[in-house]
Amino acid sequence: MPDEVTELPNLPDVTAMEFIVNGERFAMDQGTLQSYLRTLDLHTGEATRTVQWKSPAGAALELTFRRFVSLDNEHIAAFSVEVTPTNQDIELVVNSGISTRNSNTGSQHCVEGEMRMLPGGILRLMTHTNESNVPISVHCLHKFSAEPSESLPVIERRRFVGRYTFRLAKGQTLRIEKLTCYHTGRDLPFTVYGQQRGTTNPDIVAAAGDALAAKFADTGYDALLAASAKKWAAYWAEQDVQIESDDSFDQLGMRFALYHLNIMIKRDDDRVGIGAKGMTGEGYKGHSFWDTEMFLMPYYLLTDPAAAKTLLGYRWRSLPGAFKKGQREWLSGCYVPLGECMAGRRRSNAALLRCGYRHRQEQPGFDRYDRAAYLCGYCLECLAVLPSHRR
């Protein structure tokens, strides 16, 4: 729609795994939920859920779900599920793969794409964004502790899954590993400095994903987690803040904040900022607000100057668009939006207020920086041009 603004799109989903137990779908709002526990290990970045569940027909199961996004290799997300029937033998059908049925509150930013099974049982989805035509490849490989009695690929509308059937004896534990990777045309290896868009060639992106997914055959969930946990250990050794308090929640709260400060920034890419919701959801459409400089920049300046430089570089990239907007508004300086996304793109949509004035969620900002070595050596144009008049 003409008045919509750029937003951070949700990419195809690899998290969903469907379990059919003796013909009945596992769902916590059906049957009997006997116990549930969810934890996040801040030291390793691994999330775990443990569930005890009884189907409407009476089959009891224990399930343990584990997942993480790798800090060692940003392309990788891995999942592990253990299923144990505790009171009877069962037939278990697992549907797991890649889905493009997800959306941003109803807006689907990716086309349905091309689905293919590669050698070794690797599922691949090739798609691209609707407007900017950014190519995206998603790969996943499943590993099982027991061989399925039946295995076949299933292609549905906007979903590509493998369907695997197992017969488990009472007390037998089946372990499922799902190893996945994402690549896009905006990835740094495909991007020449100064060009935000990267490549629109899907073959290049697919080849990168194919090469990484092929390595999954020689590794597994535990090895990938160990590599990621090693990077987390280095982070905590450098950045941990210890609090003396009678309430242990104070220490937990501090480390939870540090955890998010580590995952919400891409230190090697100044084309992206930090969304107002960080990595917790799609609120504010993934736009960066002045909260970044007000609340987050001091932390990075003190603990990680290279990350702070990246965030400043992100703002610097938006200056050409801000100056153009200033010209459109009859200002001699730059007109910086309250909420910012990609440089040169429209950020904040207009709202018609009851007072009768047309209001935009943006303000002209004018700051003067003195004795700033960063500005002198990197971008003097960041010095704001004071307007000769104000509207």
Predicted regions: what they are:
Residues 58, 71-72, 384-391:
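A conserved hydrophobic secondary-structure block that centers on an alpha-helix together
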Residues 1-284:
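Acidic/polar, glycine-enriched structural segments that form the non-catalytic walls/loops
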